């Protein structure tokens, strides 16, 4: 018999990080290689103003610094998520020039910030 899939719905998108990190910590989901299915009219893949070491060292501090527009990229940098599937609603008239894209996310060697 297959295991049920847990579903979490949150109003502020970045609040889902608490659930993801808890599930990683309890080994309910893998530490890495996760696929994120994201339903939204915005990609939420902005770059938060955080040092890369914070992302890896202190998830609790990280959660205080991310917001609804930039919560996904730290999970990619940390290696938790390797694919984001963004489901853009057909009724949205924003960001109409979207297309499949590959991004590189890393650390600025001078500032130690996420880029």
Regions found by a protein language model. Name each.
Residues 1-115:
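Conserved alpha-helical scaffold segments that buttress catalytic/binding sites
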């Amino acid at each position: 018999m297959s295991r049920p899939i847990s579903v979490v719905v949150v109003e502020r998108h970045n609040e889902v990080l608490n659930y993801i990190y808890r599930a990683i910590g309890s080994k309910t989901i893998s530490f890495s290689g996760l696929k994120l299915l994201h339903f939204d009219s915005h990609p939420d893949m902005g770059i938060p103003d955080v040092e890369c070491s914070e992302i890896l060292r202190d998830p609790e501090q990280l959660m205080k610094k991310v917001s609804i527009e930039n919560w996904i990229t730290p999970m990619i940098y940390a290696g938790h998520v390797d694919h984001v599937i963004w489901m853009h609603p057909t009724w949205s008239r924003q960001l109409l020039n979207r297309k499949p894209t590959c991004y590189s996310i890393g650390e600025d060697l001078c500032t130690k910030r996420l880029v």
